[in-house]
């Protein structure tokens, strides 16, 4: 009779263990949450000179690690240095002309113009008097009609010269016209724009790395004459590291921007990387062939971009990654 309570006690213990184990399994499943499969994004960029010319030197080769701001290569600078000097001279000329237009005319120039008017007035008065006398002589048939016509022509020419001198004096006294000043200003601005372009062209004859990365290919060698935009290097961008994954509509609410996740690779199954969802595509697409999850292959899915916050050199582009959602990842 004593054995019966013992058996009952053992049964209770076993039942409690089963319940606890089931709860632990269920809780672990809840904590593990959503699992996705993706790949480290392959990000490459073709680097080129924005201007054309002869390649003077290349500072890196295939396989080299490069840093943002590093000089990678240079074209022959001489043509661009000459163009820059010409542009600077053009600005100087245009600036001087504009300054003259703003300053107006000097007192000496106005005095000279006034003297020219007096001289032209005297010449006109003489020509007019001479013409008047010739008219009287022609009426008395002392001179020919041709002589009278010559006197009229001289008078008209003197009158035109006087008007031109008067107009010039009037302009000198009133200063340059607004239209002339505006034209000089526009010429100066055009010369300044040409100078800025020449400076930019000289700057762009040096190829600078836009970001950190690894040089994949070197397409040309020193001495090559390139057209503008011709590819010189292909670079794999190493930072930031992005993981591309896909989620179906059922689990879309778990993949919100800012959500933290754990990232596992085959080489580090017990030491995950940490990431944060940076982008969720607003439109669905058919599942790409690269998606490994069988139950997603026929679904419409949404693309995720996950930014790896603690990436190192072991995380290579194209590498398969397991993305783990869960309370631990979400609250780290």
Swiss-Prot record:
Residues 1-20 form the signal peptide. Pfam families: HlyD_D23 (PF16576). Residues 145-207 form a coiled coil. Disruption phenotype: Mutant shows increased sensitivity to chloramphenicol. It is found in: Periplasm. Induction: Repressed by the transcriptional regulator CecR. One of its GO terms (cellular component) is plasma membrane. Gene3D superfamilies: 2.40.30.170, 2.40.50.100, Helix hairpin bin. Keywords: Coiled coil, Periplasm, Signal. GO terms for biological process: response to antibiotic. InterPro entries: CusB_D23, UPF0194_membrane_YbhG, UPF0194_transport. Could be involved in the sensitivity control to chloramphenicol. Belongs to the UPF0194 family. HAMAP family: UPF0194. This is UPF0194 membrane protein YbhG. It comes from Escherichia coli (strain K12).
């Amino acid at each position: 009779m004593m054995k019966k309570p013992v058996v009952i006690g053992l049964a209770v213990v076993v039942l409690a263990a089963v319940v606890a184990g089931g709860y632990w399994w269920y809780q672990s499943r809840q904590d593990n949450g959503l699992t996705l499969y993706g790949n480290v994004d392959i990000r490459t960029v073709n680097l080129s000179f924005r201007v054309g010319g002869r390649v003077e030197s290349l500072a890196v080769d295939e396989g080299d690690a490069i840093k943002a701001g590093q000089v990678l290569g240079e074209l022959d600078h001489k043509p661009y240095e000459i163009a820059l000097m010409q542009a600077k001279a053009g600005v100087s000329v245009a600036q001087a002309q504009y300054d003259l237009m703003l300053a107006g005319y000097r007192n000496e120039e106005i005095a000279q113009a006034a003297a020219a008017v007096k001289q032209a007035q005297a010449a006109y008065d003489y020509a007019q008097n001479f013409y008047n006398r010739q008219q009287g002589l022609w009426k008395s048939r002392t001179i020919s009609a041709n002589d009278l016509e010559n006197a009229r022509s001289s008078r008209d020419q003197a009158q035109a010269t006087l008007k031109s001198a008067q107009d010039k004096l009037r302009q000198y006294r009133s200063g340059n016209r607004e239209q002339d000043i505006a034209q000089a200003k526009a010429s100066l601005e055009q010369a300044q724009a040409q100078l800025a372009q020449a400076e930019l062209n000289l700057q762009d004859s040096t190829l600078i790395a836009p970001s950190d990365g690894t040089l994949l290919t070197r397409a040309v060698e020193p001495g090559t004459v390139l057209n503008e935009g011709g590819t010189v290097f292909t670079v794999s961008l190493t930072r930031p590291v992005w993981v591309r994954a896909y989620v179906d509509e059922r689990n879309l609410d778990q993949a919100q921007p800012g959500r933290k996740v754990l990232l596992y690779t085959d080489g580090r199954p017990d030491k995950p990387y940490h990431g944060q969802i940076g982008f969720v595509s607003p439109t669905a697409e058919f599942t790409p062939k690269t998606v490994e999850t069988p139950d997603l292959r026929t679904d419409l899915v949404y693309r995720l971009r996950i930014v790896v916050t603690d990436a190192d050199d072991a995380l290579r582009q194209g590498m398969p990654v397991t993305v783990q959602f869960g309370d631990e990842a979400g609250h780290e």
